[in-house]
């Protein structure tokens, strides 16, 4: 459980011969107990999932001669709206006590992405971001 909530995430993708990765869709299900504002839960999961996907595809802190190369978010790559795949969120009905939602979408996207990549390509990566291994995102679903 993440913050008292249970979450599952699946990535549907295809890998091209040149290591281009087309992410077709992201599907998450969350059981966060009693939901009083489903729109907020959807927004938190969608945003957290895309934030985590950006980190999994591109982001790392790099050092050169002992100095961090990223000074702020202007050189820390994030997905743009036109690059983002569809995100499907399913809220599991529950009468349990409410759990956390804020960061739950972010935590699972990396492992889900690596599992989908392994299933599609046969290559099992153990480090993120994917760009380190030569993979790059391709637009379009």
Q: For each predicted feature, which ranges?
A:
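Cofactor-binding beta-sheet edge motifs in enzyme active sites
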Residues: 1-141
């Amino acid at each position: 459980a993440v913050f008292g909530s249970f979450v599952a995430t699946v990535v549907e993708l295809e890998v091209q011969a040149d290591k281009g990765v087309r992410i077709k869709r992201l599907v998450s299900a969350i059981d966060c107990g009693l939901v009083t504002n489903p729109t907020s839960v959807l927004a938190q999961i969608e945003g957290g999932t895309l934030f985590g996907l950006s980190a999994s595809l591109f982001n790392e802190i790099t050092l050169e001669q002992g100095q961090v190369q990223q000074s702020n978010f202007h050189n820390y790559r994030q997905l743009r709206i036109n690059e983002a795949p569809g995100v499907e969120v399913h809220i599991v009905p529950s009468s349990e006590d409410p759990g956390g939602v804020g960061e739950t979408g972010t935590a699972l996207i990396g492992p889900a992405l690596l599992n989908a990549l392994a299933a599609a390509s046969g290559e099992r990566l153990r480090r993120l971001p994917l760009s380190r291994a030569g993979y790059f995102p391709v637009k379009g679903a």
